[in-house]
């Protein structure tokens, strides 16, 4: 037992203890089963209004939980024909408590999430259920939506193709299903709109994240980016591509695979200087050219077609490295996407300008309560706890797990490994046992498909290129004789049933008969209060289901006798979780099954991270290319290598988060001020405060150093009289200035003059029919948006270059904090200056319209990929938003410092201010 496990056991924090506590609450729910069974449909439905009344009356959700869970469990039975298992209730309690429920594949996570969603929807503040793709959001939202609606709870579904009005309506529902990408992008867009009614989200109160490890761990380093069209030509991408195409690896450039970086050698630098006619490519004047060359190198040397991306209809489409799915409409940042387009000889689109960005770390930490489900989370509990303050509870399985996980089989070469994989498939297929073969990318899946096709083995292939057939393929992957080759996308959110899936087959037949999905959804339930056409469809469903179940039951027995579904992994992933997800496709609900990984020393994980210990063992044994080595010790060595990679990646994410915290504090301040303006608050006091600030700042700049201020300087006079004072203001105080010893004496006079001047402006503009309060909002919004977007780019540039400070024995993160704070202050000053100048000096004949921060119809949504510029990310907590409305971006003394240190402003960068 480790010290950590010993500590947990000593202080009652072991998983077993947590499960015992959950079981006690579960028993209280189960004890009410008969009570809710006895209710009619209308009586059961009326419970929702009753529960809401109790919440409004002050009863806590924990107090209502046993009744709410019991009522909804009964609703699931009546609508969907499923009686939730005790372990699903335990998982639901765990989610309600704001934790991660680790539930194995096939344990019913989709239904589990409905229990806490229903309970928390009683507050009428909104619940978000987050999925990894549009298909699952739509499928789960429609499926579970029938149950929620039966109980009088509204459900919205967010998908990529919705317009703003549809999104707003979906978020206004009690429960909203959507993907992490869509919800993150909606948050960014909400902070770019120019009117509050254009916002679609209504807050972040409770979120349930499906496949939480994929979203909060795997994608934590990938910022969401909204970008607009840049104005630079694309010619240089094509020129750089032609140059890079002539370079040779090792001679002209080197690749650091672990760091995923590429660098020109001295010879490569000389070739570049000669080709482009520059004297020194390292000069600052040539930085842009060097950037084009490096991105072209990354496109050629590191980004692989059918692995990292595919080309379809003349377009480069990213393949999600964790799920294997196509990410249509997403683009790599920092010119990498354009470099790939040039490499593939398709149209090169103009580089974009980052307008808004956030990471999933930032986004999900805004929720007041967040929870998650996955089949694989315990290995990452330290990270969940350290970054998100989420602990992991392993929920017991409903039936004992009997799956056999065999030791890895290791080969010297990829050729030998794949030859063995093909033989294993042929051998097992001959018995009729269903086989699922997991591959790491599209390229490998298609190669393996060709190999077994030549051996005459019929099979299905599931990858990013044919994802539309995913449901069909997965539904029958457990049938006798089935052979399925799939990338990582297979099985997240879907179950493989041994012998086939009678429910899926019955629904498919009904669709073929012309019945709508809505009718089919209602037909599969047991509630009595439905129209005649649904009752007729229910009879049809029951008939088809019984017919197919006879077939699948017979096949189920045969597959059970054959050993269940056999999983073949063709390569270990960097993360043990991804491997465990593949293993988890077999052995659901107590079914038999088996898994085994086939590995070669040429695989990326082995070559980069496992070679120093395992390779010598292989050499000592004198293995041939096609000679396998299978041993428990070897499997442990491989898992040790994976642990090292996981630790390395966690360290990277922690470092990124340190930088993220800085940018996020600044974003909270800007978005908070922007929100105040959008809500229609009277901004006049804010404007006056900004004027005072500009006068004070001018006084500070003109301090003579001998205890007095020189107000006669032409620069100070001209600046303020062009900004917020009438011409000649200083002249009328010429005699008094000579007698003044304290700057406050003069600034107080100027305050009065500036406020009087502004009052005159208000009278004049109001006489012209201009709403002064709206004019203030328009001017302030435009100034904030313009300078904030420029600031994002400047922060990107600072982040790119800050790492060099380490060579000077300085802490890059601390340097970044300090410099970014200065940059933020400069930006705030420019926002104030622009706002004051326009309000006091601009010629106005009619009220200008609020400019959109960006025309969303012309934006692109994307990600900073490997090799793309990492956009600034940070920590986004609900309580950190500013309430001080004195000036845009102004930091209150007791607010968190924008440098990201976590200290109050008065104890950090504002000390002495």
Model-derived features with residue positions:
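Proline-rich intrinsically disordered, low-complexity coils
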Residues: 66, 197, 223, 434, ...
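Compositionally biased, intrinsically disordered low-complexity regions
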Residues: 14, 440, 495, 501-502, ...
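Extended, charged helical/alpha-beta scaffold domains that provide interaction surfaces
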Residues: 36, 309-317, 323-330, 560, ...
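Short Cys/His-rich zinc-binding micro-motifs
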Residues: 887-906, 910
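Generic detector of short, well-ordered, non-transmembrane alpha-helical segments enriched
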Residues: 6, 380, 481-482, 666, ...
């Amino acid at each position: 037992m480790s010290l950590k496990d010993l500590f947990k056991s000593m202080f009652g924090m072991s998983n077993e203890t947590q499960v015992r506590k959950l079981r006690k609450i579960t028993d209280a729910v189960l004890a009410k089963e008969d009570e809710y069974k006895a209710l009619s449909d209308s009586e059961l439905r009326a419970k929702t209004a009753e529960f809401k009344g109790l919440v409004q009356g002050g009863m806590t959700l924990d107090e209502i939980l046993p009744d709410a869970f019991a009522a909804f469990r009964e609703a699931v039975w009546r609508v969907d024909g499923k009686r939730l298992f005790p372990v699903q209730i335990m998982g639901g309690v765990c989610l309600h408590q704001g934790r991660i429920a680790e539930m194995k594949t096939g344990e019913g996570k989709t239904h589990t999430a409905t229990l806490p969603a229903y309970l928390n929807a009683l507050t009428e503040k909104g619940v978000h259920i987050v999925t990894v793709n549009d298909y699952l959001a739509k499928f789960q939202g429609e499926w579970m939506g029938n149950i929620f609606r039966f109980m009088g709870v509204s459900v919205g579904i967010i998908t990529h193709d919705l317009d703003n009005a549809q999104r707003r309506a979906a978020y206004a529902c009690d429960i909203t299903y959507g993907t992490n990408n869509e919800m993150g992008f909606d948050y960014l867009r909400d902070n770019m709109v120019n009117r509050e009614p254009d916002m679609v989200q209504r807050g972040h109160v409770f979120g349930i994240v499906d496949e939480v490890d994929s979203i909060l761990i795997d994608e934590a380093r990938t910022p969401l980016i909204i970008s607009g069209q840049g104005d630079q030509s694309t010619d240089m991408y094509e020129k750089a591509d032609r140059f890079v195409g002539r370079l040779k690896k090792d001679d002209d450039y080197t690749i650091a695979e672990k760091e995923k970086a590429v660098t020109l050698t001295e010879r490569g630098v000389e070739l570049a200087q000669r080709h482009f006619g520059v004297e020194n490519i390292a000069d600052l004047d040539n930085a842009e050219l060097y950037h084009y060359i490096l991105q072209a190198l990354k496109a050629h040397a590191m980004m692989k077609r059918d692995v990292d991306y595919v080309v379809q209809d003349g377009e480069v489409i990213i393949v999600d490295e964790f799920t294997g799915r196509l990410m249509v409409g997403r683009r790599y940042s920092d010119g990498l996407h354009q470099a790939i387009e040039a490499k593939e000889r398709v149209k090169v689109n103009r580089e974009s300008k980052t307008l808004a960005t956030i990471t999933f770390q930032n986004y999900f930490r805004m929720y007041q309560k967040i929870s998650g489900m996955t089949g694989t989370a315990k290995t990452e509990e330290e990270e969940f706890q350290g970054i998100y303050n989420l602990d992991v509870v392993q929920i017991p399985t409903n039936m004992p797990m009997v799956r056999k996980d065999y030791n890895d089989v290791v080969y010297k070469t990829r050729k030998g490994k794949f030859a063995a994989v093909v033989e294993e498939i042929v051998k097992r297929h001959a018995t009729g046992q269903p086989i699922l073969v997991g591959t790491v990318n599209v390229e490998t899946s298609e190669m393996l498909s060709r190999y077994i096709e030549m051996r005459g083995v019929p099979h299905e292939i599931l990858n990013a290129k044919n994802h539309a057939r995913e449901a069909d393929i997965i539904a029958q992957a457990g049938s006798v004789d089935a052979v399925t080759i799939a990338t990582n996308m297979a099985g997240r959110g879907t179950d493989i049933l041994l012998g086939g899936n009678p429910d899926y087959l019955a629904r498919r037949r009904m669709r073929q008969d012309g019945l709508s999905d809505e009718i089919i959804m209602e037909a599969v339930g047991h509630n009595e209060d439905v129209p005649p056409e649904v009752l007729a469809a229910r009879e049809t469903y029951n008939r088809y289901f019984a017919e197919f179940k006879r077939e699948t039951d017979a096949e189920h027995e045969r597959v059970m006798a054959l050993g269940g579904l056999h999983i073949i992994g063709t390569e270990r992933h960097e993360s043990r979780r991804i491997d465990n997800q593949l293993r988890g496709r077999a052995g659901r609900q107590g079914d038999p099954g088996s898994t085994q990984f086939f590995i070669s020393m040429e695989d990326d994980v082995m070559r980069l991270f496992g070679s120093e210990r395992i390779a010598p063992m292989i050499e000592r044994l004198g293995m041939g290319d096609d000679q396998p080595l299978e041993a428990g010790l070897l499997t442990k060595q491989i898992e040790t290598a994976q642990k090292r990679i996981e630790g390395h990646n966690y360290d990277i994410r922690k470092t990124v988060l340190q930088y993220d915290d800085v940018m996020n504090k600044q974003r909270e301040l800007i978005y908070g001020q922007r929100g105040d303006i959008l809500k229609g608050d009277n901004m006049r006091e804010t404007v006056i405060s900004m004027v005072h600030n500009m006068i004070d700042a001018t006084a500070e700049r003109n301090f003579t150093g001998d205890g007095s201020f020189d107000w006669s300087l032409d620069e100070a006079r001209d600046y303020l009289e062009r900004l917020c004072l009438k011409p000649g203001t200083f002249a009328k105080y010429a005699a008094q200035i000579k007698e003044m010893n304290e700057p406050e004496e003069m600034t107080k006079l100027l305050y009065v003059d500036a406020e009087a001047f502004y009052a005159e402006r208000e009278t004049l503009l109001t006489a012209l029919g201009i709403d002064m309060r709206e004019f203030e909002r328009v001017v302030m919004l435009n100034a904030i948006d313009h300078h904030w977007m420029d600031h994002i780019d400047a922060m990107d540039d600072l982040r790119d270059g800050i790492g060099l400070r380490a060579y000077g024995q300085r802490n890059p993160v601390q340097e970044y904090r300090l410099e970014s704070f200065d940059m933020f202050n400069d930006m705030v000053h420019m926002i104030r200056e622009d706002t004051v100048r326009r309000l006091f000096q601009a010629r106005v004949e009619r009220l200008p319209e609020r400019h959109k921060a960006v025309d969303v119809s012309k934006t692109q949504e994307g990600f900073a990929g490997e090799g793309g510029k990492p956009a600034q990310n940070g920590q986004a907590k609900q309580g950190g938003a500013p309430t001080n409305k004195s000036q845009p971006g102004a930091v209150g003394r007791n607010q968190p410092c924008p440098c990201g240190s976590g200290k109050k402003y008065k104890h950090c960068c504002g000390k002495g201010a």
